Amino acid sequence: MFQELKNKYLATLKSSETEDWLDYRVIRPLCYFLAVFFAKLNIHPNAVTIASMFIGAASSIFFYHGSFYYEGWSGLWLNIIGVLLLCVADLLDCTDGQLARLTGKKSRLGRILDGMAGFTWFIPIYVLLMFRFYQHHSLEFGWLGIPDTEQNALIATAVVTALALYSGFACMGPQQRLADYYIQIHLFMLKGEKGSELDSSEQQQKAYDETPSEGNRLWKYFLKTYIDYTRKQENSTPQFQQLVKLLREKYGSAGNMPAEVRQELLRESRFLMPWNALLTFNFRCGMFFLFCLIDLPLANFLFEIICLGLLTLWINRHHEACCKKVREKVQTP
């Protein structure tokens, strides 16, 4: 019975190779039982995703408050509530995919909503963190020896706002977008086209052009957003795009690549997956929670810009170098 339950659980995962330890051992099993529960209630996966968006966005209200240093125990508990709400949002966001695989209710809209979920959480969170810094900044001012005047507070908040905008739109968004793409590439190499969601902007553009505007304006807006999302993924991985193009030209489809080519790509991808996992929710939010609880949310922006930025650059360059090496081997007669 246990083995049967385990097999059913594993069937709802994309692959154990793309999950980190916490996801595979704790979060995904919880999500499986939630998925079974929602399936019995006939709840659609997209409804679960939308619920996660609202819950994650609501957590921003609690992160607005200073933690123990500034607001004592009440502030600490408010931040802990924010942490719990964001964890629930992530739990639901993970459940939607397992529910879709369990019930067969997969859709392009579900993929689009899943990609949007994190942004709907962190846009309000980052906005309110700017206001939080304006209210509570004596720790940073004390360390830097800055007089705590209204003028200095406004100037410092303007700097933090610039950091938050850059961190959110130029770092977190692209980092998670690239991490998601590398997961889909790994699944494509591991399971082929049917086992991955490796979409191309060309395919999405075709779907957009073939969809009539009448009565589909909202859907076309979602498609347009997803086209932009996939195009940015492709622009970040030129060597991989060239490799896929060559494989299609030589073998009719990238999925028909020789086994030795697939294994070489998988070997390099398996090496990168644990590092790639650091760009996804668990590690990123673990650090975010820590910085908020110790009353240093400013450090989160610097961490994303510097530490995760350098990690993303390294992963991208390593993967691109691998794709270039494999492409040159395939080109050689």
Please provide the spans of the model-predicted regions:
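Juxtamembrane membrane-interface segments at transmembrane alpha-helix termini
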Residues: 64-67, 92-94, 174-178, 314-325
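Alpha-helical transmembrane segments
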Residues: 130, 147-186
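Cytosolic-side membrane-entry/anchor segment at the start of a transmembrane helix
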Residues: 6-23, 27-29, 33-41, 90-130, ...
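Structural signal for membrane-spanning alpha-helices in multi-pass inner-membrane proteins
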Residues: 56, 60-64, 125-132, 292, ...
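Membrane-embedded alpha-helical segments that form the functional core of polytopic membrane enzymes
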Residues: 45-109, 122-126, 150, 157-170
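Small-residue-rich segments of transmembrane alpha-helices in multi-pass membrane proteins
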Residues: 54, 58, 113-128, 191-201, ...
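C-terminal membrane-associated helical module and adjoining short loops/tails
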Residues: 1-30, 181-333
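Select subsegments of transmembrane alpha-helices in polytopic membrane proteins
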Residues: 45-53, 114-122, 273-282
